[in-house]
């Protein structure tokens, strides 16, 4: 049976574009559908733009494996495509003596995950690196960094186009049905609604992944995990950034905690926190800054009163609710939903940006196999 194209990707965020990039490199004619007017307008545009080392995630998990692999690929890609980035390193800080045992457990996990460039620091060594830091002990992740996420996605889009792929913005996904001879008929909405057939379908739609999977005919409802919206707000401050390195407290259940980063423009930013919400709402309540002061002063006691200014908010597609275990990413193929040629990605939150190129290779391997 002939099809209009080899593969259709739903979602032109970092992960969807990385999937398309991996497929066009393998010779797949690929089209990316994006409901917004430009690429990277969802989860990919409202995050910390941090390149993660891969410290925290359980050994053997998709997050651990694809973060470490993806980070290596990402630095190479950013350098070869002249996308702004900096391997500035990250300090994970124990601010109380009783936290040191947890810090050492993170180091053990990082080593088990194959993370390079890890160094255990005493409090004095950490303060020598970053005067003004409060630390009983710290871990230095030398391979962590920051990047221009939009520049990265623009570079991916350029590679996709150069290899014959296409990105259709303002083109919402309206549903799909499996074809008897294999493949899918994919319906689009919007002003130019149409139907196109493809051998393969990849749903990399971030917050919309569950809804998109639900519009695929015969997709089993029990194979679609619940979606929980994890909102996080960010604050910034004027003046000189206090630290050169990223600074993270010990992680809290379900998140990495409110951390500090210096972006590529030299601006200090703090966040995100975590609030489970019922609807997409990107407003920033200035009152949430009160909790930020208390959290930040645990590792930076000299944060001045009144320094924090509301910045922006993001929403993460979490697969767990408050108090529930923090699960792995879901990258589901026929073994999970029974539909050959379809890959659905659920819960691709942090470190999804870091791992995106490895995620794309993983998805391409599933379809090519």
Predicted regions and their residues:
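Glycine-rich FAD pyrophosphate-binding loop
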Residues: 24-46
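C-terminal lid/capping helical subdomain adjacent to the catalytic/cofactor pocket in oxidative enzymes
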Residues: 26, 180, 326-369
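N-terminal Rossmann-like FAD-binding beta1-loop-alpha1 element of flavoenzymes
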Residues: 5-32
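Helical element adjacent to the flavin cofactor pocket in flavoenzyme catalytic cores
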Residues: 139-200
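Glycine-rich phosphate/pyrophosphate-binding beta-alpha loops
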Residues: 56, 144-146, 252-255, 342-356
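Short beta-strand to alpha-helix junction loop
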Residues: 58-69, 93-102, 140-159, 168, ...
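Active-site substrate-recognition segment that forms the wall
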Residues: 22, 51, 83-86, 194-196, ...
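Dinucleotide-binding Rossmann-like beta1-alpha1 core, especially the glycine-rich loop
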Residues: 49-125, 135, 257
């Amino acid at each position: 049976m002939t099809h209009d194209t080899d593969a259709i990707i739903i979602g032109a965020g970092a992960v969807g574009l990385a999937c398309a990039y991996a497929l066009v490199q393998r010779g797949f004619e690929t089209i990316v559908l994006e409901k917004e007017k430009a690429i990277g307008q969802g989860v990919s545009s409202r995050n910390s733009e941090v390149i993660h080392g891969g410290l925290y995630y359980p050994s053997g998990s998709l997050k651990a494996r694809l973060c470490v692999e993806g980070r290596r690929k990402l630095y190479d890609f950013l350098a070869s495509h002249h996308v702004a980035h900096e391997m500035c390193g990250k300090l994970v800080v124990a601010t109380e003596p009783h936290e040191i045992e947890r810090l050492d457990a993170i180091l053990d996990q990082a080593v088990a995950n194959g993370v390079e460039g890890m160094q255990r620091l005493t409090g004095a060594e950490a303060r020598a690196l970053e005067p003004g830091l409060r630390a009983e002990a710290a871990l230095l992740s030398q391979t962590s960094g920051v990047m221009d996420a939009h520049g990265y996605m623009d570079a991916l889009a350029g590679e996709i186009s150069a290899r014959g792929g296409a990105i259709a913005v303002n083109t919402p996904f309206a549903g799909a049905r499996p074809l008897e001879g294999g493949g899918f008929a994919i319906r689009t909405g919007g002003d130019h609604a149409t139907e196109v057939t493809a051998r393969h379908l990849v749903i990399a739609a971030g917050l919309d992944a569950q809804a998109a999977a639900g519009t695929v005919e015969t997709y089993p409802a029990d194979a679609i995990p619940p979606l929980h919206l994890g909102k996080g707000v960010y604050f910034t401050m004027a003046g000189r950034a206090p630290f050169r390195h990223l600074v993270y407290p010990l992680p809290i259940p379900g998140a990495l905690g409110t951390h500090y980063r210096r972006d590529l423009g030299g601006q200090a930013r703090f966040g995100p926190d975590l609030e489970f919400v019922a609807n997409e709402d990107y407003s920033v309540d200035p009152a949430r800054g009160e909790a930020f002061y208390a959290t930040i002063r645990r590792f930076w006691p000299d944060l001045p009163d009144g320094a924090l200014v509301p910045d922006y908010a993001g929403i993460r597609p979490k697969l767990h609710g408050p108090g529930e275990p923090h699960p792995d990413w879901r990258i589901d193929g026929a073994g999970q939903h029974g539909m050959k040629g379809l890959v659905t990605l659920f819960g691709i939150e942090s470190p999804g940006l870091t791992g995106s190129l490895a995620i794309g290779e993983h998805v391409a391997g599933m379809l090519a196999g």
